Amino acid sequence: MAAGSTGERPFFEIITSIRYWVIHAVTLPSIFLAGFLFVNTGLAYDAFGTPRPDAYFQATDTKAPVVSQRYEGKAQLDVRLK
């Protein structure tokens, strides 16, 4: 070991190893697929409480809602959406 070395493998050695790619060939695509399904199934909207794209405006609306009171904005929008 060289002086000052922590004993860890160099990054280049890790990413050029077969073991790294065997593990990551499965995990990286599965993380991407999980995120894709999380968003496309609408679970992300439910988990974070955001309105779905079709719920921003009512069918009768012709323009975006305007909030007139800074601290009562959510209450104004909730009344409007009922």
Curated annotation (Swiss-Prot):
Main localization category: membrane
Family matches, as InterPro entries: PSII_cyt_b559_asu, PSII_cyt_b559_asu_sf, PSII_cyt_b559_N, PSII_cytb559_asu_lum
Domain of life of the native organism: Bacteria
Membrane-spanning ranges: 22-36
Alphabetical keyword list: Electron transport, Heme, Iron, Membrane, Metal-binding, Photosynthesis, Photosystem II, Thylakoid, Transmembrane, Transmembrane helix, Transport
Note on cofactor: With its partner (PsbF) binds heme. PSII binds additional chlorophylls, carotenoids and specific lipids.
Location within or outside the cell: Cellular thylakoid membrane
CC annotations in GO: photosystem II; plasma membrane-derived thylakoid membrane
Listed cofactors: heme b
MF term (GO), any: iron ion binding
Membrane topology listed for this record: Single-pass membrane protein
Residues the record lists as binding heme: 24
GO BP annotations, alphabetical order: photosynthetic electron transport chain
Complexes and interactors: Heterodimer of an alpha subunit and a beta subunit. PSII is composed of 1 copy each of membrane proteins PsbA, PsbB, PsbC, PsbD, PsbE, PsbF, PsbH, PsbI, PsbJ, PsbK, PsbL, PsbM, PsbT, PsbX, PsbY, PsbZ, Psb30/Ycf12, peripheral proteins PsbO, CyanoQ (PsbQ), PsbU, PsbV and a large number of cofactors. It forms dimeric complexes.
Function: This b-type cytochrome is tightly associated with the reaction center of photosystem II (PSII). PSII is a light-driven water:plastoquinone oxidoreductase that uses light energy to abstract electrons from H(2)O, generating O(2) and a proton gradient subsequently used for ATP formation. It consists of a core antenna complex that captures photons, and an electron transfer chain that converts photonic excitation into a charge separation.
Family: Belongs to the PsbE/PsbF family.
Protein name: Cytochrome b559 subunit alpha
Source organism of this protein record: Synechococcus sp. (strain CC9902)
